[in-house]
Amino acid sequence: MFALSARHALRRTRIFAIPRFFADSRQDSDNPDKRYSGPAATMDNKSEKVTVNKEELRKRLTPVQYQVTQEAGTERPFTGCYNKHYEKGVYQCIVCHQDLFSSETKYDSGCGWPAFNDVLDKGKVTLHRDASIPGGNILLLIAHPERIRTEVRCARCNAHMGHVFEDGPKPTRKRYCINSASIEFVNADPATSSPPVATPTAAPIAQQ
Protein backbone atom coordinates (compact mmCIF):
# COMPACT_ATOMS: atom_id res chain seq x y z
CA MET A 1 0.00 0.00 0.00
CA PHE A 2 2.85 2.38 0.82
CA ALA A 3 4.65 1.52 -2.42
CA LEU A 4 1.49 2.23 -4.38
CA SER A 5 1.12 5.66 -2.76
CA ALA A 6 4.74 6.51 -3.48
CA ARG A 7 4.28 5.57 -7.12
CA HIS A 8 1.25 7.81 -7.42
CA ALA A 9 3.14 10.64 -5.73
CA LEU A 10 6.02 10.30 -8.20
CA ARG A 11 3.59 10.30 -11.12
CA ARG A 12 1.89 13.44 -9.85
CA THR A 13 5.28 15.12 -9.34
CA ARG A 14 6.26 14.42 -12.93
CA ILE A 15 2.99 15.69 -14.33
CA PHE A 16 3.12 18.93 -12.36
CA ALA A 17 6.80 19.38 -13.26
CA ILE A 18 6.20 19.36 -17.02
CA PRO A 19 4.43 22.76 -17.23
CA ARG A 20 7.25 24.29 -15.20
CA PHE A 21 9.81 22.94 -17.69
CA PHE A 22 7.79 24.36 -20.58
CA ALA A 23 7.60 27.75 -18.87
CA ASP A 24 11.35 27.79 -18.24
CA SER A 25 12.09 26.93 -21.85
CA ARG A 26 10.00 29.85 -23.12
CA GLN A 27 10.52 32.66 -20.66
CA ASP A 28 13.80 34.00 -22.03
CA SER A 29 12.70 33.99 -25.68
CA ASP A 30 9.80 36.27 -24.76
CA ASN A 31 12.08 38.96 -23.32
CA PRO A 32 12.11 41.94 -25.76
CA ASP A 33 15.34 43.26 -24.27
CA LYS A 34 17.37 40.46 -25.87
CA ARG A 35 16.78 41.22 -29.53
CA TYR A 36 18.96 42.68 -32.33
CA SER A 37 19.08 43.08 -36.09
CA GLY A 38 21.39 46.05 -36.77
CA PRO A 39 24.57 45.99 -38.86
CA ALA A 40 27.62 44.20 -37.51
CA ALA A 41 29.75 47.30 -37.99
CA THR A 42 28.07 48.95 -35.01
CA MET A 43 28.84 46.07 -32.64
CA ASP A 44 31.94 45.01 -30.77
CA ASN A 45 32.49 41.32 -30.02
CA LYS A 46 31.42 41.25 -26.37
CA SER A 47 28.41 39.42 -24.96
CA GLU A 48 26.43 42.55 -24.15
CA LYS A 49 22.67 42.21 -24.45
CA VAL A 50 21.29 43.72 -27.63
CA THR A 51 17.83 44.40 -29.04
CA VAL A 52 16.52 42.59 -32.11
CA ASN A 53 14.29 44.35 -34.62
CA LYS A 54 12.26 41.45 -35.99
CA GLU A 55 11.11 43.25 -39.15
CA GLU A 56 14.64 44.24 -40.15
CA LEU A 57 15.86 40.77 -39.30
CA ARG A 58 13.30 39.18 -41.63
CA LYS A 59 14.72 41.28 -44.47
CA ARG A 60 18.33 40.37 -43.72
CA LEU A 61 18.02 36.65 -43.02
CA THR A 62 16.74 33.84 -45.21
CA PRO A 63 13.43 32.24 -44.15
CA VAL A 64 15.29 29.22 -42.78
CA GLN A 65 17.77 31.37 -40.84
CA TYR A 66 14.93 33.38 -39.34
CA GLN A 67 12.88 30.33 -38.38
CA VAL A 68 15.87 28.63 -36.76
CA THR A 69 17.22 31.61 -34.81
CA GLN A 70 13.98 33.37 -33.87
CA GLU A 71 11.47 30.52 -33.67
CA ALA A 72 13.78 27.75 -32.40
CA GLY A 73 13.38 25.74 -35.57
CA THR A 74 15.77 23.03 -36.70
CA GLU A 75 17.13 22.50 -40.20
CA ARG A 76 16.90 19.00 -41.66
CA PRO A 77 19.92 16.78 -40.88
CA PHE A 78 22.72 16.56 -43.46
CA THR A 79 21.46 19.64 -45.33
CA GLY A 80 23.34 22.47 -43.59
CA CYS A 81 26.26 24.09 -45.41
CA TYR A 82 28.60 23.69 -42.42
CA ASN A 83 27.93 20.03 -41.63
CA LYS A 84 31.01 18.86 -43.57
CA HIS A 85 32.90 22.15 -43.47
CA TYR A 86 36.41 22.02 -41.95
CA GLU A 87 38.30 25.14 -43.00
CA LYS A 88 40.19 26.94 -40.24
CA GLY A 89 38.42 29.91 -38.75
CA VAL A 90 35.63 31.04 -36.46
CA TYR A 91 31.87 30.50 -36.54
CA GLN A 92 29.78 33.53 -35.60
CA CYS A 93 26.14 34.05 -34.66
CA ILE A 94 24.27 34.84 -37.90
CA VAL A 95 22.16 37.46 -36.10
CA CYS A 96 24.66 39.59 -34.13
CA HIS A 97 28.00 38.30 -35.48
CA GLN A 98 29.42 37.33 -32.11
CA ASP A 99 32.25 34.74 -32.29
CA LEU A 100 30.92 31.51 -30.78
CA PHE A 101 32.80 28.45 -32.02
CA SER A 102 36.24 27.64 -33.41
CA SER A 103 37.15 25.21 -36.17
CA GLU A 104 39.64 23.75 -33.68
CA THR A 105 36.78 22.19 -31.70
CA LYS A 106 34.64 21.11 -34.69
CA TYR A 107 34.36 17.40 -35.40
CA ASP A 108 32.24 14.96 -37.41
CA SER A 109 29.70 13.49 -34.99
CA GLY A 110 27.67 11.82 -37.72
CA CYS A 111 24.47 13.40 -36.41
CA GLY A 112 23.84 15.50 -39.53
CA TRP A 113 24.49 18.92 -37.97
CA PRO A 114 27.74 20.84 -37.30
CA ALA A 115 29.19 19.59 -34.01
CA PHE A 116 31.65 21.26 -31.64
CA ASN A 117 33.02 19.92 -28.37
CA ASP A 118 33.38 23.37 -26.83
CA VAL A 119 32.57 27.06 -27.24
CA LEU A 120 35.10 29.87 -27.56
CA ASP A 121 33.95 31.30 -24.24
CA LYS A 122 31.29 29.96 -21.87
CA GLY A 123 29.96 33.49 -21.42
CA LYS A 124 29.09 33.76 -25.12
CA VAL A 125 26.24 31.27 -24.96
CA THR A 126 23.40 30.61 -22.55
CA LEU A 127 21.90 27.21 -21.77
CA HIS A 128 18.20 26.59 -21.20
CA ARG A 129 16.05 23.56 -20.43
CA ASP A 130 14.11 22.72 -23.57
CA ALA A 131 10.87 20.87 -22.93
CA SER A 132 9.66 21.04 -26.53
CA ILE A 133 8.84 17.58 -27.77
CA PRO A 134 9.49 16.28 -31.31
CA GLY A 135 6.10 15.11 -32.55
CA GLY A 136 4.30 16.74 -29.63
CA ASN A 137 4.30 13.52 -27.58
CA ILE A 138 3.98 14.92 -24.06
CA LEU A 139 3.31 11.46 -22.60
CA LEU A 140 6.78 10.41 -23.75
CA LEU A 141 8.33 13.30 -21.85
CA ILE A 142 6.29 12.53 -18.73
CA ALA A 143 7.49 8.93 -18.82
CA HIS A 144 11.09 9.92 -19.58
CA PRO A 145 11.87 13.34 -18.05
CA GLU A 146 15.57 12.70 -18.70
CA ARG A 147 14.85 13.42 -22.37
CA ILE A 148 14.44 17.12 -21.68
CA ARG A 149 17.15 18.71 -23.80
CA THR A 150 19.50 21.63 -23.18
CA GLU A 151 19.06 24.45 -25.66
CA VAL A 152 21.99 26.67 -26.71
CA ARG A 153 21.39 30.36 -27.43
CA CYS A 154 23.66 33.29 -28.26
CA ALA A 155 24.23 35.22 -25.04
CA ARG A 156 24.24 38.55 -26.85
CA CYS A 157 21.06 38.43 -28.97
CA ASN A 158 19.29 35.33 -27.61
CA ALA A 159 19.23 33.62 -31.03
CA HIS A 160 18.59 29.88 -30.99
CA MET A 161 21.72 27.94 -32.01
CA GLY A 162 20.86 24.31 -31.33
CA HIS A 163 21.33 21.93 -28.39
CA VAL A 164 24.19 20.54 -26.31
CA PHE A 165 24.49 16.87 -25.36
CA GLU A 166 26.77 14.93 -23.02
CA ASP A 167 28.03 12.43 -25.62
CA GLY A 168 30.92 14.32 -27.20
CA PRO A 169 34.64 13.46 -27.34
CA LYS A 170 37.24 14.13 -24.67
CA PRO A 171 38.19 16.30 -22.92
CA THR A 172 34.83 18.07 -22.60
CA ARG A 173 32.49 15.17 -23.41
CA LYS A 174 30.20 17.82 -24.92
CA ARG A 175 28.51 17.84 -28.31
CA TYR A 176 27.22 21.25 -29.29
CA CYS A 177 24.79 20.30 -32.06
CA ILE A 178 24.42 23.57 -33.98
CA ASN A 179 22.27 24.54 -36.96
CA SER A 180 24.21 25.78 -39.98
CA ALA A 181 21.44 28.35 -40.45
CA SER A 182 22.28 29.95 -37.11
CA ILE A 183 25.97 30.59 -37.79
CA GLU A 184 28.31 32.08 -40.38
CA PHE A 185 31.96 31.24 -40.97
CA VAL A 186 34.90 33.65 -40.96
CA ASN A 187 38.00 32.11 -42.53
CA ALA A 188 41.33 32.47 -40.75
CA ASP A 189 42.91 33.03 -44.18
CA PRO A 190 40.46 34.78 -46.55
CA ALA A 191 42.78 34.12 -49.51
CA THR A 192 42.08 30.37 -49.30
CA SER A 193 38.39 30.62 -48.50
CA SER A 194 35.82 28.71 -50.55
CA PRO A 195 32.05 29.06 -50.15
CA PRO A 196 30.34 26.26 -48.21
CA VAL A 197 27.85 24.09 -50.08
CA ALA A 198 24.36 23.50 -48.71
CA THR A 199 21.96 20.76 -49.74
CA PRO A 200 18.60 22.19 -50.87
CA THR A 201 16.03 21.69 -48.14
CA ALA A 202 12.45 22.47 -47.26
CA ALA A 203 11.37 24.36 -44.15
CA PRO A 204 13.06 23.41 -40.88
CA ILE A 205 11.59 20.71 -38.70
CA ALA A 206 11.45 20.84 -34.92
CA GLN A 207 13.64 17.83 -34.29
CA GLN A 208 17.32 17.52 -33.37
From Swiss-Prot:
Basic and acidic residues compositional bias, start-end: 27-36
Keyword Transferase: no
Keywords: Cytoplasm, Cytoskeleton, Disulfide bond, Metal-binding, Nucleus, Oxidoreductase, Zinc
Cofactor field: Zn(2+)
Ranges of residues in domain MsrB: 54-188
Organism: Drosophila melanogaster
Residues at the active site: 177 (nucleophile)
Gene3D superfamilies in alphabetical order: Peptide methionine sulfoxide reductase (2.170.150.20)
Region feature (Disordered): 27-48, 189-208
Effect of residue 111 to S: Thioredoxin-dependent activity reduced, but no change in DTT-dependent activity
PROSITE patterns: MSRB
Disulfide bond annotation, renumbered to this chain: 111-177
Protein name: Methionine-R-sulfoxide reductase B1
Reaction(s) catalysed (UniProt annotation): L-methionyl-[protein] + [thioredoxin]-disulfide + H2O = L-methionyl-(R)-S-oxide-[protein] + [thioredoxin]-dithiol
Family: Belongs to the MsrB Met sulfoxide reductase family.
